[in-house]
């Protein structure tokens, strides 16, 4: 098996590539669409900051052969991403609509859990462009997450204010 340091480096590489939307095309070639501001240079900087070995080459690829081009287009499941944007948006909107009916402690707990899921989805989103994903649906999801964040912050401000007003419970210390 791999040594401990090799496993740590492998995990760092996989995490950096995944967080940046790269997918494995063949044995040693990871790629992503070149649709981000800054192109390969910005991707390289981000990957290195996220833990990719600084000796790993990061470059732009053009003119893949037809078979690799076909395979490359199958690496991201755009339909699944679109569905996750839509489902996430609907779930958060529904929660926002009834959040004021929840007890404050329940609302705080749920806002934390749902918010965690939404943030994770945003962090791991590969930020693909049309036609791979529905960019409007992703934008709608992101807009709802921003609104949800404001609602959640308000809930947590009230929750923390309420907690700070409660007297501390005495604790009996036994020797």
Stretches with model-predicted labels:
Residues 3-95:
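Mid-protein regulatory/catalytic core that forms ligand/cofactor-binding pockets
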Residues 1-2, 119:
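Short, hydrophobic/proline-enriched secondary-structure or compact coil segments at domain edges
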Residues 66-175:
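C-terminal regulatory/effector modules of DNA-binding transcriptional regulators
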């Amino acid at each position: 098996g791999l040594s401990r340091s090799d496993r740590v480096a492998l995990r760092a590489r996989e995490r950096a590539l995944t967080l940046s939307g790269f997918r494995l095309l063949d044995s040693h070639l990871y790629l992503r669409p070149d649709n981000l501001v800054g192109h390969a240079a910005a991707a390289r900087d981000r990957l290195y900051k996220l833990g990719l070995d600084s000796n790993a080459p990061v470059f732009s690829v053009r003119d893949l052969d037809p078979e690799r081009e076909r395979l490359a287009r199958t690496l991201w499941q755009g339909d699944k991403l679109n569905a996750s944007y839509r489902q996430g948006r609907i779930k958060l909107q529904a929660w926002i609509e009834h959040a004021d009916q929840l007890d404050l402690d329940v609302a705080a707990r749920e806002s934390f859990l749902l918010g965690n899921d939404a943030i994770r989805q945003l962090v791991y989103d590969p930020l693909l462009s049309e036609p791979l994903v529905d960019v409007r649906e992703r934008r709608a999801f992101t807009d709802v997450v921003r609104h949800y964040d404001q609602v959640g912050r308000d809930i947590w401000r009230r929750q923390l204010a309420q907690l700070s007003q409660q007297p501390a419970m005495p604790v009996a210390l036994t020797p």
